A protein has these predicted regions:
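Alpha-solenoid helical repeat scaffolds
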Residues: 1-197, 202-234, 240-242
Length: 242
């Protein structure tokens, strides 16, 4: 659509062109129209739809850029929009921004308080190495879930935060509840938690159980050898003392 004698075509004319391009599945031309609408009539619907079309074209850089612009203008007020933006940040390897967006959405009661969204916030903070922010989100995610997987993931976060007793308790709860994708990995976390608590016998049992799965057999054996060497080291230290 062309501007004539410096006059701006009416918004509905652009929308008619947009509709016709969509009807023909000419999405490149539809994007051109949407980008023009964004310049002259910067409404939420145009920002969001253009972002969606860039997503369809696998251009996540422009998709995220438009979502960011819409977010900064306060246009994104739906749970699905904020969740989408958080995932885009994660895909762009920007977990801190993902955590910030979803956390604010939850705090402002714009994002639905369901397990999956708390998990998204917790995972984003964990990836950003913000363990203290991740823990309460993962706690809420696990509490709202019927399966044990999220309790195991919570155990991982507790372990990262040096909360070893809570890590062991959470992993045990997850294994008991069931639905854990990799029980062997969960038992490795359990073993590491017990090791850091100085409960070597429990740690050894956990690693042996983990090693029953060939995918964790190597790490299990390494940990068991390490426990044995640590026990021997402590015995030698006691000898030196007395």
């Amino acid at each position: 659509m062309h501007e004539v004698e410096g006059k701006l075509p009416k918004e509905q004319w652009y929308n008619l062109a947009r509709f016709l391009y969509f009807d023909k599945e000419d999405y490149d031309s539809a994007l051109d129209v949407l980008n023009t609408l964004i310049i002259y009539y910067p409404k939420k619907q145009y920002w969001v739809q253009a972002s969606h079309l860039y997503g369809e074209k696998k251009d996540e850089t422009r998709q995220l850029a438009l979502m960011e612009a819409a977010y900064e203008q306060g246009f994104l007020d739906r749970s699905s929009e904020l969740v989408t933006m958080a995932y885009l940040y994660l895909n762009a390897e920007a977990p801190y921004y993902a955590g910030s967006v979803i956390q604010k959405g939850l705090d402002d009661e714009l994002v639905e308080e369901k397990s999956k969204n708390f998990e998204l916030a917790g995972s984003a903070w964990a990836q950003a190495r913000e363990v203290e922010k991740s823990i309460p989100m993962m706690e809420k995610a696990a509490a709202k879930s019927d399966e044990g997987e999220l309790y195991v993931r919570l155990g991982n976060v507790y372990l990262d935060g040096d909360q070893f007793a809570k890590a062991a308790e959470s992993v045990q709860k997850g294994l008991k509840r069931g639905g854990v994708k990799r029980p062997d990995q969960a038992r490795l976390v359990l073993g590491m938690s017990y090791f850091n608590l100085g409960e070597y016998n429990k740690a050894r049992r956990a690693f042996r159980d983990a090693g029953k799965d060939e995918r964790s057999e190597k790490y299990s054996k390494q940990w068991i050898r390490y426990i044995t060497s640590e026990e021997q080291r402590q015995i030698e230290l006691q000898k030196d003392i007395f």
